[in-house]
Amino acid sequence: MKFEAILFDCDGVLVDSEPITHGVLRQMLAERGWDMPIAECMRHFIGRTVRSQAALIAARTGRPLTDDWMTAFYARRDAELHARLQAIDGAPQAVRAAHAATGGRIACASGADRGKVVLQLRKTGLDAWFGPHVFSGHDLPRSKPAPDVYLAAARALGVAPARCLVIEDTVTGVQAGVAAGATVWGYCAQGADGGPLVEAGATRLFARMGQLPELWM
């Protein structure tokens, strides 16, 4: 295998969290007066932190985004994730195969807050494969689309970014991996439009996580 390390995004790649997270976000924004379909909510926020959209939220709701509101959002989101979250079909097998193929040089590098990432990996049993190599953009100077989280993951694994394969599902995530100097493949579920991922720099698209081990051999 030409890659020495494999770096996975979390939301939408390893765990099917996006509908849950954005369902809670949509509901809480509706309570503030910004009511929209779930598809519109995901279009505004997927691949981005809620705080990065503070100006948009303030403009649509007429109220600033506060720490208290974020704390309430995290609590409601995490309760729903704990109750309902499942791994993406094929993700456990892909992670296990990546661990074996790289001699354990794998990492989870997410733009989400660390508490969410850790909760999700534990809930799905994927935490055992990543060990200490779990990285959050919230812990770094810049989150995705900046490369910081992928650079931190590569550095911790002792692998040059150019020898890393990044698995992503959003434009901002692909941009982060490309900016880090890694090869980026885009996970694009059947029927989804992969064009934006390719435009952002993904060199390969695939539709099933379970097929991933066949592709890097």
Task: Label the predicted regions.
Residues 1-4, 96-97, 102-103, 113-217:
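Asp-based, Mg2+/Mn2+-dependent phosphohydrolase catalytic module
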Residues 2-10, 14-100, 115:
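N-terminal helical cap/lid subdomain that shapes the substrate entry/recognition surface
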Residues 110:
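Conserved phosphate-coupling serine/threonine residues in phosphotransfer and NTP-handling enzymes
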